[in-house]
């Protein structure tokens, strides 16, 4: 095993399985078909990491946005109870279309509960270890963007999820390892104990800081170096469409910066070891970065074992 084959194996680990991706797409299409024929619905938009092709294993939810016609709901979009009203309406329609007696496909949705922005819909048995939800978010189209409800503040906030979808697609078209590399740094974030890092934070950082056209190890090392410098400087990580402000206001920036700096240092040492033809040491150091899910170096750590890299497809998974 060498560094290249170790990264290929790790890519397979962080990628969601083909079966889970197919299941997620089917659920997304189910909601699209169910709401696409509704008289008060303008369109249904795929959203979230599945739509961007950056979801990692396991898939926790599938995001879909139901854009309602403003003329059918003139009271929506204003501060006050209309945010809760929109969520209640969406929940009622999900149950009517896909619940036990659903008119579109009965029994697909077992139960629902709305959260701050969306209605969370459970389709799996409660004891299914691979269960994941569909999160249906109501929205209105306004001034070229979307307005979505925020129940806690009783307000509607502006957003543009299609901006990020297009931006990620552009990066991946330039460098076909971009989406896979995003999954890797999101997997890194999920392993950090004591600090909650939203996956979207890592994705937005990668959009700005992940270099394109380099080998994957070098690109990820440079990403960690740049990300550590940015977070250490106290610069906010904002919505890339410049509409929603900070992505994670409660993020512990100091601890996040420490973790990024540690990853940058280990990644830099790994690249140096690889340059010095010590593949085993490099693999061990990348394991220090990513954790136990990264492949271990060969048992004969003092010798060089250079295997021909396998071909791994990194197809867009959205």
Describe the predicted segments one by one.
Residues 1-6, 239-318:
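Terminal (often C-terminal) interaction modules
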Residues 19, 25, 98-237, 314-318:
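Catalytic cores of NTP-dependent nucleotidyl/adenyl transfer enzymes across multiple folds
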Residues 66-70, 210:
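Short beta-strand-to-loop capping motifs
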Residues 58-62, 130-132:
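A short, glycine/Asx- and small/polar-enriched loop/turn
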Residues 78-99:
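A generic, well-ordered mixed alpha/beta core segment in the N-terminal half of proteins
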Residues 1-59, 70-84, 317-318:
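N-terminal regions immediately upstream of nucleotidyltransferase
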Residues 72, 234-236, 275:
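Extracellular/luminal regions of secreted and cell-surface proteins that mediate adhesion/ECM remodeling
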């Amino acid at each position: 095993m060498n560094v290249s084959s170790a990264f290929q194996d790790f890519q397979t680990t962080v990628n969601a399985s083909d079966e889970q991706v197919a299941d997620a797409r089917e659920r997304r299409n189910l909601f699209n078909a169910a709401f696409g024929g509704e008289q008060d619905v303008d369109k249904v938009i795929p959203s979230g990491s599945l739509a961007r092709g950056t979801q990692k294993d396991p898939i926790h939810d599938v995001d879909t946005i139901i854009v309602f016609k403003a003329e059918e709901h003139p009271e929506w979009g204003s501060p006050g109870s209309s945010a809760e009203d929109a969520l209640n309406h969406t929940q009622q329609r999900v149950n009517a279309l896909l619940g036990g007696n659903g008119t579109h496909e009965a029994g697909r949705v077992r139960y629902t509960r709305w959260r701050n922005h969306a209605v969370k819909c459970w389709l799996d048995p409660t004891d299914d270890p691979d269960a994941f939800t569909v999160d249906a978010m109501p929205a209105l189209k306004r001034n070229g963007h979307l307005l979505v409800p925020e129940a806690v503040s009783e307000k509607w906030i502006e957003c543009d999820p299609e901006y990020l979808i297009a931006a990620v697609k552009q990066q991946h078209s330039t460098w076909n390892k971009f989406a896979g590399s995003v999954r890797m740094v999101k997997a890194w974030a999920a392993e950090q104990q004591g600090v909650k890092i939203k996956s979207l934070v890592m994705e937005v950082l990668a959009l700005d800081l992940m270099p394109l056209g380099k080998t994957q190890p070098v690109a990820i090392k440079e990403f960690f170096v740049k990300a550590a410098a940015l977070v250490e400087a106290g610069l906010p990580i904002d919505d890339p469409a410049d509409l929603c402000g900070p992505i994670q206001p409660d993020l512990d920036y100091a601890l996040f910066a420490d973790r990024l700096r540690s990853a940058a240092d280990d990644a830099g040492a790994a690249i140096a070891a690889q340059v010095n033809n010590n593949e085993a040491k490099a693999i061990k150091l990348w394991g220090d970065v990513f954790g136990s899910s990264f492949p271990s170096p060969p048992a004969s750590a003092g010798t060089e074992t250079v295997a021909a890299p396998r071909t791994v497809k990194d197809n867009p998974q959205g």
